[in-house]
A protein has these predicted regions:
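Aromatic-Pro/Gly-enriched surface loop or interdomain linker
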Residues: 1-65, 233-242
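Extracellular ligand-binding/catalytic regions of CAZymes and related secreted enzymes
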Residues: 2-4, 180, 188-242
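Short hydrophobic segments within beta-strands
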Residues: 8-10, 101, 196
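Solvent-exposed loop/turn segments at secondary-structure junctions
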Residues: 14-15, 53, 75-78, 104-109, ...
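Catalytic beta-strand/loop cores that center a nucleophilic Ser/Cys/Thr
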Residues: 44-47, 120-195, 232
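Structural motif
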Residues: 67-72, 97, 195
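A glycine-rich, often tryptophan-bearing local segment used as a flexible ligand/cofactor-contacting loop or short
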Residues: 76-143
C-alpha cells in the first residue's frame, strides 16, 4: 500500500474571525477549505495548524511528521515566533516540502528561504486574472489546460523581488495590464519550495477547482525524496593517501 503524503495546512486564521466578508466565504477558515479539498485526493493525510495555537501548531513533533507544509499569512507575519521559523527552515533544508500561498510572499519563512525582500506591486480592484500554464509537462501543471481564469482577484505585479526560480510554471496576466510570475519552484537543501500567487481572502479562490488542483499537484511534487539532516563531517579518505 502506498504511503500517504502527510500534509500540514498552516493558516494565520485572523481575517476569517474579524471580517464578515471573509467569514462568509470561509466560515471555518481558509485552512479548513484547503484541507477539505486535499482530503478528497485520496493520497494525503491532512491536518491543520494556526497562529493562535501553542508554538503556532508547529511543534517539533508536528514538523517531523509533516511531509509538506502549506502556508497562508497576511496580517500577522511579524507575530510568528522566529524560533518557529528556524524550526521550519531546518525541516525544509532536511527535505520537507513548503508551499507558500498568495500573501505568504511576505511571510518570515518565505523571505528566509529566498534571501530577498519578496516585494511586489499590488492592487485590490476585483479584476480578472488569467494564469498561463507555461510548463505543461511539469508535475504541478498536470491536468491544467493552456490557461485558466479567476474572475475577481487582487492584482500582484512585477517586479517580484525573488531569486530566479529554478522553474517557472505559471505566468499571470491581469485585466489592468500587469503580469506576474505566479507559479515558482525552487530547491533549498533537500527540500522543494513552491510559491503560488492566487488566494486573496475576500474572493472564493480556494473554492476554485483549478487552484486546488494546482495545490494538490504541488503537494505531490514537494513530497520529500529524502529526509536527512545536514552535517559537516570530518571524513576519512576512500583511497589510500601517499
Amino acid at each position: 500500500m502506498t504511503k500517504k503524503i502527510r500534509v500540514t495546512v498552516w493558516n494565520e486564521f485572523i481575517h476569517e474571525k474579524n471580517n464578515k466578508a471573509v467569514k462568509d466565504i470561509y466560515p471555518d477558515g481558509m485552512h479548513a477549505t484547503i484541507t477539505k479539498a486535499l482530503k478528497t485526493e485520496g493520497d494525503m493525510d491532512v491536518r491543520t495548524a494556526t497562529l493562535e495555537e501553542p508554538e503556532h501548531g508547529l511543534t517539533e513533533a508536528v514538523l517531523k511528521s509533516t511531509d509538506v507544509l502549506t502556508w497562508w499569512g497576511h496580517m500577522a507575519h511579524d507575530k510568528v515566533d522566529d524560533k518557529i521559523i528556524d524550526r521550519v527552515q531546518k525541516n525544509v533544508l532536511e527535505g520537507m516540502g513548503l508551499i507558500c500561498l498568495h500573501s505568504a510572499h511576505f511571510s518570515k519563512i518565505f523571505r528566509r528561504m529566498m534571501g530577498t525582500t519578496c516585494s511586489l506591486k499590488w492592487r485590490e480592484a476585483g479584476e480578472r486574472e488569467r494564469l498561463w500554464n507555461i510548463a505543461p509537462s511539469h508535475p504541478i501543471t498536470e491536468g491544467i489546460g493552456e490557461y485558466f481564469e479567476l474572475p475577481h482577484t487582487e492584482m500582484y505585479g512585477e517586479r517580484f523581488d525573488i531569486p530566479e526560480p529554478d522553474q517557472l510554471v505559471f505566468i499571470s496576466w491581469f485585466q489592468g495590464g500587469e503580469v506576474f510570475r505566479s507559479g515558482c519552484c525552487w530547491e533549498r537543501g533537500h527540500g522543494r519550495i513552491f510559491y503560488f500567487r492566487p488566494g486573496h481572502e475576500t474572493y472564493p479562490i480556494y473554492h476554485d477547482k483549478n487552484v486546488m488542483k494546482v495545490i494538490a499537484n504541488a503537494v505531490r511534487w514537494a513530497n520529500p525524496r529524502i529526509r536527512q539532516e545536514h552535517v559537516c563531517p570530518n571524513t576519512k579518505p576512500i583511497e589510500k593517501l601517499s
